[in-house]
C-alpha cells in the first residue's frame, strides 16, 4: 500500500462571488470569506476567474493574492489572456480547466490530449515562473499519461460523475466511477504526478476519497457554502475537515 500523503483542504470561494453579483455591490465579499475559511482551517483558497467574469472578478483575484496568508489556487481556462493575468497575479498554483460560456459549472475534464500543443507552452511558462500547474482532468489513463508528458506537476481528478451517481443513488455507476478514480490516482502517482480531487464533493464523498493514500488535496466549494447557510462557514469547514480526517483514519486502520 502507498504511504498516505498529508491531506490538504482548499476552499473555493466562487459561490460567495456568485451571491454578491446576483444583486451587485460589494457584499458578500469573497475575500472576507477566504479569510474566514483560513481561520476555520482551510489550507488554501481556490478561485476561478472565468472569461465571462460571472463570479470572481479580476479585482477579487488581486485582493486574494494580496490579503490571504495561505496558497492561492487560480482556476482558469487555458487562453493567452488568462495566462497573462495569472503570470501577473503570481498565485501559488494555477489549475487549468475547460470552460464553456453556456455551462452552469465546469462540466467535464480538460482534454489534455487534444489540446497538448496549446497547453505545453503555457505549462512551461508557469513552471519557469515558479507557479505550480494543475490539470483538471477525468480519471482516464491516456489523459493522465499525457499530463505527465506535458510536465505538469499536479492533476486534479474530476470527481463530479462519481459524486452525481452517489447522490442519485445509482450504485452501479457510482462504483464504476469510483474504480476509475482509484485506478487513476494510482497511475498518476506512479508517473510522478501529485494528485488532487474536486467537483461535487460533500461530507460523505470527501470522507470516502480521503481514504485514497495518493490524494494530497481536495478542493471543495459549493457544498461548504451551501452548508454554511445553515451552520455557518466555520462549522461547515470544521465538519469537512472532520470527514477528511475520518477517511484518513480508515486508511491508517487498514494499513
Curated annotation (Swiss-Prot):
Catalytic center at which residues? 48, 75, 199
State the oligomer form and interacting partners: Homooctamer; tetramer of dimers.
Report the Gene3D superfamilies cross-referenced here.
Answer: Aldolase class I
Record-listed 3-amino-2-oxopropyl phosphate binding positions: 12, 23, 200, 221-222
Source organism per UniProt: Rhodopseudomonas palustris (strain BisB18)
Q: Which residues form a coiled coil?
A: none
Instruction: Tell me which Gene Ontology terms the entry assigns under biological process.
Output: pyridoxine biosynthetic process
Catalytic activity, EC: 2.6.99.2
Pfam families to which the protein is assigned, alphabetical:
PdxJ
Q: Where in the cell is it found?
A: Cytoplasm
Keywords assigned by UniProt?
Cytoplasm, Pyridoxine biosynthesis, Transferase
- Which terms in the Gene Ontology molecular function aspect does this entry carry? pyridoxine 5'-phosphate synthase activity
> Which residues are 1-deoxy-D-xylulose 5-phosphate-binding?
14-15, 50, 55, 105
UniProt site positions, description: Transition state stabilizer: 156
Q: Which gene encodes it?
A: pdxJ
Q: Which domain of life is it from?
A: Bacteria
Return the protein name. Answer: Pyridoxine 5'-phosphate synthase
Reactions performed catalytically: 3-amino-2-oxopropyl phosphate + 1-deoxy-D-xylulose 5-phosphate = pyridoxine 5'-phosphate + phosphate + 2 H2O + H(+)
A Gene Ontology term for the protein's cellular component: cytosol
Give the family from UniProt. Belongs to the PNP synthase family.
**Per its database record, what is this protein's job?**
Catalyzes the complicated ring closure reaction between the two acyclic compounds 1-deoxy-D-xylulose-5-phosphate (DXP) and 3-amino-2-oxopropyl phosphate (1-amino-acetone-3-phosphate or AAP) to form pyridoxine 5'-phosphate (PNP) and inorganic phosphate.
Pathway named in the protein's UniProt entry:
Cofactor biosynthesis; pyridoxine 5'-phosphate biosynthesis; pyridoxine 5'-phosphate from D-erythrose 4-phosphate: step 5/5
Q: Which CDD domains match?
A: PNPsynthase (cd00003)
Amino acid at each position: 500500500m502507498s504511504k498516505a500523503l498529508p491531506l490538504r483542504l482548499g476552499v473555493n470561494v466562487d459561490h460567495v462571488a456568485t451571491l454578491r453579483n446576483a444583486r451587485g455591490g460589494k457584499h458578500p465579499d469573497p475575500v472576507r470569506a477566504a479569510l474566514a475559511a483560513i481561520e476555520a482551517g482551510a489550507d488554501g483558497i481556490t478561485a476561478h476567474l472565468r472569461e465571462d467574469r460571472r463570479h470572481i472578478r479580476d479585482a477579487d483575484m488581486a485582493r486574494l493574492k494580496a490579503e490571504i496568508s495561505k496558497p492561492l489556487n487560480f482556476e482558469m481556462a487555458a487562453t493567452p489572456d488568462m495566462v497573462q493575468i495569472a503570470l501577473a497575479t503570481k498565485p501559488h498554483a494555477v489549475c487549468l480547466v475547460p470552460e464553456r460560456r453556456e455551462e452552469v459549472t465546469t462540466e467535464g475534464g480538460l482534454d489534455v490530449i487534444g489540446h497538448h500543443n496549446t497547453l505545453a507552452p503555457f505549462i512551461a511558462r508557469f513552471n519557469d515562473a515558479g507557479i505550480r500547474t494543475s490539470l483538471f482532468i477525468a480519471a482516464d489513463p491516456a489523459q493522465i499519461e499525457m499530463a505527465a508528458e506535458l510536465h505538469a506537476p499536479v492533476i486534479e481528478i474530476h470527481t463530479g460523475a462519481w459524486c452525481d451517481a452517489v447522490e442519485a443513488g445509482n450504485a452501479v455507476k457510482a462504483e464504476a466511477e469510483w474504480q476509475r478514480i482509484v485506478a487513476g490516482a494510482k497511475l498518476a502517482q506512479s508517473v510522478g504526478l501529485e494528485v488532487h480531487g474536486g467537483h461535487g464533493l460533500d461530507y460523505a464523498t470527501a470522507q470516502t476519497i480521503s481514504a485514497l493514500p495518493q490524494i494530497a488535496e481536495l478542493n471543495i466549494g459549493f457544498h461548504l457554502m451551501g452548508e454554511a447557510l445553515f451552520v455557518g462557514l466555520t462549522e461547515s469547514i470544521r465538519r469537512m475537515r472532520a470527514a477528511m480526517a475520518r477517511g484518513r483514519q480508515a486508511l491508517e486502520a487498514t494499513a
